Structure formats: C-alpha cells, structure tokens
C-alpha cells in the first residue's frame, strides 16, 4: 500500500466514482435533504462519519466471517453494524446538536437504509481493500457524498431565490434536471489519470 494507491482511492471516491453522481447510491437523502445548505452539510457529515466507521467495523466483521466460513452472512452483518452506528449518531445528535437532529428529521434514521453506506462496505470487500484502504475509501466516499449534496443544495437554494424557473419546472423537476447536469459535470473526471 502506497500513498499513490491511497490518493487514487481518495480521488476516485470523491470525483470519478462519486457515490451520488457516478454510482447513483444514496439518492433518497440527496434529494430529500438538499433544500437548505445547513441541513445538507449536516446530513453529509453524518453520512461521512457513518461511512468511515462502517468501513472499519465491516472490515473487521468480514475477517471474522471469512475465518468462520460465513461469507454468505456479509450483507446481514453489515446492515446490523450500520444500524448500530446510525443509532449512535442519532443519540449523539439528539443530545449535542438538537437543531440539526430536528432538521434532519426522518432522514437521519434512513441512513440505516442508505445504499451508499451499505455500498461502501460491500465495495470494500469486493475490491479486496485492506483495513487502511477500506477506511480511506469510506471516509473519502463520505466526503464525495458531502461534496455532492453541498453543491446540489447550494444550486437548489439559488434556483429557489432567483424564481426564474418556468412554472412547469418549479420544485422537484428542476432539482432532477440540476442533478443530471451535475452528474454530467462529474463524469468529466472519469478520464482523470493519477500517475
């Protein structure tokens, strides 16, 4: 494992293989929580935290499952780990940052079923990453999610403020068009070569 490998994993997770724009994972909170920048950043930070921890714990769980010959239980075990981590984040936010807890509302418990969080754990196993690579991929994948939801929320806020949208595009339709255009912009990174 070299710094070049970690850099390639990081750039891939943030830009070229962004969970939102390239792999289309985590779309529900992306569309649901992106109306305000503050809420979007809070959700992105929570997802980043859970993805980083889930990557670490799921790597260790996978070692135990492989040693016991229970590889077929990976998905179930990963979901249980993610559910526990989300409960921890929910209790932490409720106690320490109640305004963010209220703003995230129903979307916070939905991190448990966020396919981006489960996807990072499964992709770590599929790509045969070691512990450090798994954690780096989880954290930078979360940062890519945070970047995507932040940029999308910023554009959505500006579109709401401007009010120049055709009536047929008000609300959700213009959000989908914006997400599509942003995905095209991120696809421009797919030709990026790292060393």
Q: Language-model features: where?
A:
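Hydrophobic core segments of alpha-helical transmembrane domains in multi-pass membrane transport
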Residues: 8-9, 16, 47, 52, ...
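Cytoplasmic-side transmembrane-helix entry/capping segments in multi-pass membrane proteins
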Residues: 38-49, 73-78, 100-112, 167-173
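Structural signature of hydrophobic alpha-helical transmembrane segments
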Residues: 6-21, 69-84, 136-148
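Interfacial loop-to-transmembrane junctions
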Residues: 157-176
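C-terminal ends of transmembrane helices
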Residues: 25-39, 86-100, 152-163
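Generic transmembrane alpha-helix signature in multi-pass membrane proteins
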Residues: 24-32, 91-95, 107-110, 115-128
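Helix-coil boundary and interhelical linker segments in multi-pass alpha-helical membrane proteins
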Residues: 1-7, 60-73, 122-135, 191-195
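Ordered, amphipathic secondary-structure segments that act as subunit-interaction surfaces
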Residues: 60-105
């Amino acid at each position: 494992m070299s710094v070049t490998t970690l850099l390639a994993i990081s750039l891939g997770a943030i830009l070229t293989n962004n969970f939102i724009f390239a792999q289309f994972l985590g779309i529900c909170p992306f569309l649901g929580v992106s109306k305000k920048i503050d809420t979007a950043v809070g959700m992105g930070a929570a997802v980043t935290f859970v993805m980083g921890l889930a990557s670490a714990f799921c790597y260790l769980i996978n070692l135990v499952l492989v040693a016991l010959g229970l590889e077929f239980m990976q998905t179930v075990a990963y979901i249980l780990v993610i559910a526990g981590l989300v409960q921890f984040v929910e209790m932490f936010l409720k106690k320490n940052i109640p305004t963010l807890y209220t703003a995230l509302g129903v979307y916070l418990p939905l991190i448990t079923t966020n396919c981006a969080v489960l996807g990072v754990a499964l992709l770590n196993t599929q790509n045969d990453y070691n512990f450090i690579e798994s954690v780096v991929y989880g954290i930078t994948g979360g940062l890519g999610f945070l970047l995507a939801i932040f940029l999308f929320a910023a554009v959505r806020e500006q579109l709401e403020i401007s009010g120049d949208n055709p009536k047929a595009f008000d609300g959700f339709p213009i959000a989908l068009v914006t997400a599509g255009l942003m995905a095209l912009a991120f696809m421009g990174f797919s030709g990026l070569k790292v060393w």
